[in-house]
């Protein structure tokens, strides 16, 4: 996940408020995750959510649920309520050759596509015979 326009939040309200936003985002993501899932801060305003034992379809739906939750209610900070949206890149193990690194790369590229399309989206990175493709899942259109 990546917070849309996070630099603008830091620039307008300052880094301490930006930190409040990051903490609130982590809490909201954790509330929508299962007990077996793992949420970690990847750096800056980026998070990784590992969903063991899920299909790509299930992962997309969890990501969409989180995206809607974040965007539906402004985050209350010491500077007031701040509307926030996030973009999510999703990848799932699809073959025996998949590694943690290949999944991170595919999810990161999917996230980049989401940001290019204006943000506030879930984009799935899938493997095909022709190589990886990045698309909005049909069930989310």
Regions found by a protein language model. Name each.
Residues 53, 90-94:
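PAS-family sensory domains and close relatives that share small-molecule sensor folds
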Residues 49, 84-86, 124:
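HATPase_c (GHKL) ATP-binding subdomain of two-component histidine kinases
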Residues 1, 47, 86-90:
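A structural signal for short, well-ordered beta-strand segments
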Residues 41, 70-86, 103, 115:
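Catalytic core regions of nucleotide second-messenger enzymes
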Residues 5-53, 57, 61, 65, ...:
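Cytosolic catalytic cores of cyclic-nucleotide second-messenger enzymes
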Residues 2, 44, 107:
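Conserved metal-coordinating catalytic motifs of nucleotidyl cyclase and c-di-GMP turnover enzymes
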Residues 60-63, 93-124, 130-141:
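Catalytic-core segments of nucleotide cyclases and related cyclic-nucleotide turnover enzymes
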Residues 54-57, 80, 98:
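Conserved catalytic/ATP-binding subdomain
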